[in-house]
Amino acid sequence: MTDMVYAGQVALVTGATRGIGAAIALTLAERGVKVIGTATTDEGAGKINAALAGRVGCRGVRLDVNDSAAADALVDAIVKEHGALHILVNNAGITRDQLAMRMKDDDWDAVLDTNLKAVFRLSRAVMRPMMKQRYGRIVNVTSVVGA
């Protein structure tokens, strides 16, 4: 079902390998959006490619959302390839659930880096092209599960 409102737009969906992110990526693709879904591994990117197979302009890519340079490079590549980036869905997330008194600093830092700092980094990366095209949507997803 193509949706004339979204058809032809370009979306970047982080954490698109499974769960909420996979559902968002597939739903957007079904509505005619060119979806670039991110995964933390090449295997995950392959799963996204399989899920979006046959949909023009859709693909999975590997991205460390905690790497600012990689995020900037991906956004630049998307804009260069498609001429625009209309939608960012910040969905990537992790959890390191345990009692606070047992949580290690490294685990806490990893959760904040992925669930908070990466949202800022990716949002910052898309702001310039979105402002230049005078259109853009940033959607931030949270979950109790975190992944």
Feature map (PLM): residue ranges:
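The beta1-alpha1 cofactor-binding region of Rossmann-like NAD(H)/NADP(H)-dependent oxidoreductases
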Residues: 62-73, 105
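Catalytic loop of short-chain dehydrogenase/reductase
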Residues: 139-147
